[in-house]
Regions:
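Short amphipathic alpha-helix segments
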Residues: 17-27, 41-53
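Short, exposed beta-strand/loop patches in secreted or surface proteins that constitute
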Residues: 34-41, 61-64
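Short proline/glycine- and acidic-rich turn/helix-capping motifs at secondary-structure junctions
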Residues: 37-43, 104-107
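A short, structured beta-strand/loop element
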Residues: 45-68
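Secondary-structure transition/turn motif
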Residues: 50-54, 73-80
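A conserved amphipathic terminal alpha-helix motif
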Residues: 81-107
Length: 107
């Protein structure tokens, strides 16, 4: 199952870069940065995984500079996407509340 989260932000530094440099705080929300841009893949993406037991899935994060928007795809196979989505939204609203203008979740 895939869930897409669109986060429209104020102009400024890439939110994906800020998330990538915030590993200590990510762990407080049960998330860990597992990958960041590889030379063989499109630039501007990161991948998060949950550290909570029994909570699978991954979050693929892409920063759209022109739209100043963060696009997050939550991908799970059999697990409920709710817990990992909630962890991400909680983290974003706690850390970047002033930068976020709109947050939309599309199941």
């Amino acid at each position: 199952m895939q869930t897409v989260i669109h986060v429209v932000c104020t102009p400024g530094v890439s939110l994906r870069d800020r998330i990538g440099g915030d590993e200590r705080r990510l762990t407080k929300f049960g998330l860990v940065l597992s990958e960041q841009k590889r030379m063989s893949r499109q630039q501007g993406w990161s991948k998060l995984h949950s550290t909570r037991p029994g909570q699978g899935g991954a979050i693929n994060i892409h920063w759209d500079r022109a739209a100043t928007a963060l696009v997050c795809r939550v991908v799970t196979r059999t697990e409920d996407p709710g817990p990992i989505t909630g962890d991400l939204v909680g983290y974003l609203l706690t850390r970047f509340r002033r930068r976020i203008q709109a947050l939309t979740i599309v199941p």
